[in-house]
From Swiss-Prot:
Purpose of the protein: Participates in electron transfer between P700 and the cytochrome b6-f complex in photosystem I.
Membrane topology: Peripheral membrane protein
Species assigned in the record: Sambucus nigra (European elder)
The keyword Mitochondrion is assigned to this record: no
Pfam families: Copper-bind
Domain called Plastocyanin-like: residue spans: 1-99
Coiled-coil zones: none
Highest rank taxon of the organism: Eukaryota
Result of altering residue 17 to G: In 50% of the molecules
Protein's name according to its UniProt entry: Plastocyanin
Length: 99
């Protein structure tokens, strides 16, 4: 499944921002805009036992150019919340449910 970082209209958002995947399906986050974005999973908002650092980009690492991607595969069932660290304050947050 492919998730876009940034809307065609320049909005600071994950598109879609709320989605579900089967366990083990690769999720690819793709920068869709000229702004630097990243993907960080909230350590308090992932299933118990999941190390958020292992599935997140570093807070300092950014997808700077349109078309740059970051992929992750989630295997533990449950709900994961994530955000873009530069734009979290602007509401750039999302949620994935792993079935």
């Amino acid at each position: 499944v492919e998730i876009l970082l940034g809307g065609e209209d320049g909005s600071l958002a994950f598109i879609p921002s709320n989605f579900s995947v089967p366990s083990g399906e690769k999720i690819t986050f793709k920068n869709n805009a000229g702004f630097p974005h990243n993907v960080v999973f909230d350590e308090d908002e992932v299933p118990s036992g999941v190390d958020s650092a292992k599935i997140s980009m570093s807070e300092d690492d950014l997808l700077n150019a349109p078309g740059e991607t970051y992929s992750v595969t989630l295997t533990e069932s449950g709900t994961y919340k994530f955000y873009c660290s530069p734009h979290q304050g602007a509401g750039m947050v999302g949620k994935v449910t792993v079935n």
